[in-house]
Amino acid sequence: MRLSEHILSNLKKPKFTLKPDVILSPGGPKTGYEITVEDRIITYVGPAQSSGSLALTGYAIVPGFIDAHTHAGQTFGKSLIGGEPSQIWKRIWNPMEAALTPDTAHISAKWMFLEAMRGGYTCLVNFSTNQRDLNAAVHRAAGETGIRLVSSSAVDEHYTDQEGKSAVRSPLEIAEMVEDHLSLCDESTQIIPSICSTSFHTNSEDALIRLSQMCIDKGIKLQIHSNEHFPEIQDCVTRFGKRPIEFMADIGILGDHLLLHHATLVTDREIELLSASNTPVSYNPLASIWKGNAVAPALAFQQRGVKFGIGSDTTSADGFKNLSAAEACQRITHCMPIDDFSAGAAWTWTSAASNGSAVAAGIDGSVGSLLSGLEADFLLVDMLRPECMPSHDFEWEFVRYYNRDQIDAVVISGEPVVFGGKAVNWDDESFINQNIGTAYSVASAPEIIRVHGPSSDHRPSV
């Protein structure tokens, strides 16, 4: 059976059982298995036993990708980064996000969520500097599309006010901002709250300690960019005599309540500090390729027990492109010099892209794996493509040969949200056509500076 309305009608039922050729379980690919979903929840995954299951010959069911690090306010600037030197956030992202209004924040987020779901993502971990009005707009976009969202609000002690002046928040103001964000996230079961500290230098030591403790007390994640670029490392060493992860360990804020983003420029000692404190990180391979200074040692993380997920950092919303990059980056930077051809043996990356990201984001108790009792977030993937046939090793093929156009259905909380590449419950074509002008406008904020400029500027004259 190929893609059909019959499949879609079954996915829309409150209870359904599917029997594909392959189910990607936490223990690897399984054949002869079925999955039952009832009222949003997976109630059974195991050997086929139901006479009423829908046979899906030529299909695989896999966990939805979870993007462990992205920025929903940067959607329309992604192609501006071509050739740009690092610390793009100073020249492109900060001006773009500072110019967002509730309307443009909503459009930017909804556009990203559509891209992400088409790319196989069922959940995004958003890092934002948004205050309440912009986050409300982002949450509205999440509700309209059906995506799962780890929402965030930047709670920086040192910040720039609306007049462009440096300002400082009091401890009371910071506590009130945390509570306000929590209350906003309570409005939807598919929105999970988190808090951001843009970096170690946007909060004092005391503020970081207080913020860390608040997140522990509230049971939410504190997201921090860490060890991403050379200037950040040098600044931390100059100011504190320590590298960023060493500094955070010294003030006692490392732990599983944190989610550190990038961690590319790390020493062996810093890896050990992450491992000893059970601090998870996001591994962003495409960001390293396109705009980074280094590649995170993800295989070293794995070997030393550092939990990590895979993030896009607003490079590409194609889950397969990020999955392939995750393996390729490790193969080239860490495995090729020592003649290691396994480079994680494929399963490392399929696991990191789903359950690994869920663990890093602190949501593995509800999503990230195809297990009974978890919410039904999964992809229906067409296996009958020449690029993937004949099949000998599903996970290697999934990492290296599968493509976004093989995703026939995206299911979140047991409900189809994308089918055949199109949104199920809203008109995505009309949305794009109506808002393409806004997309160009957002990417043309007056303070944006491109150092490299368009590709055509560098083409030799003929």
Regions found by a protein language model. Give the residues of each.
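N-terminal metal-binding scaffold of metallo-dependent hydrolase/deaminase domains
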Residues: M1-S50, A60-I61, P454, P460-V462
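Alpha-helical scaffold segments that flank or form the walls of functional sites
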Residues: T36, S79-I147, E173-E187, Q434-Y440, ...
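Active-site glycine- and acidic-residue-rich loops that bind
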Residues: S128-R132, S194-R210, I289-W290, A360-G362
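His/Asp/Glu-enriched, well-ordered alpha-helical/loop segment
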Residues: D250-H257, L299-R385
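C-terminal cap of metal-dependent C-N hydrolases
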Residues: E375-N425
